[in-house]
Amino acid sequence: MSSFESVVVIDGKGHLLGRLASIVAKQLLNGQKIVVVRCEALNISGEFFRAKLKYHSYLRKMTRYNPTRGGPFHFRAPSRIFYKAVRGMIPHKTARGAAALERLKVFEGVPPPYDKKKKMVVPQALRVLRLQPGRKFCTVGRLSSEVGWKYEDVVSRLEERRKAKGAAYYERKKVAARQLSEAKKSAKVNDKTAEALKEFGY
């Protein structure tokens, strides 16, 4: 992610939560606009039971006088958990940090128009490259559903629909490419057209 682009769309599946958050935070402060999709498929290192205990410990932290108003506010959705991880790595109470957070968008699943855009991965944050083989891990989506997130089945159903649509589009694209190559092979060019093409270097 060294080169600057207008908007970078990152597929969160298979990335470690903290490592991806640190890289995203740095790029946001540099002025890059970033969209992270499929936050429910982000990974957390360590076994699920340990992550759940840590989250329940976090849920017990509150203000004494008015928790509903004074916070801290405990986010359950995977996208908001990732957002809060990034926010903790940015000076969000300054103008520079607030402007950086404005450049971040996070989603569960892959909503339009990002389903038709090229998505990237961050090798420095991929679990298969950063964790040793055999190490335990869990997904943010499973943790969220255990602590109160209610939309895991909705997101999974929409994802299945999106994948089916994408597979059908790819099959149509393969058929069209095959027909085009066959048409190019069988196309006949008369002498006049061949001379005109030769004049332009074809």
Swiss-Prot record:
The keyword Cell cycle does not apply. SUPFAM superfamilies: Ribosomal protein L13. InterPro entries: Ribosomal_uL13, Ribosomal_uL13_CS, Ribosomal_uL13_euk/arc, Ribosomal_uL13_sf. Gene3D superfamilies: 6.10.250.3250, Ribosomal protein L13. It is found in: Cytoplasm. GO terms for cellular component: cytosolic large ribosomal subunit; ribosome. Keywords: Cytoplasm, Ribonucleoprotein, Ribosomal protein. One of its GO terms (biological process) is translation. Belongs to the universal ribosomal protein uL13 family. This is Large ribosomal subunit protein uL13. It comes from Neurospora crassa (strain ATCC 24698 / 74-OR23-1A / CBS 708.71 / DSM 1257 / FGSC 987). The gene is crp-46.
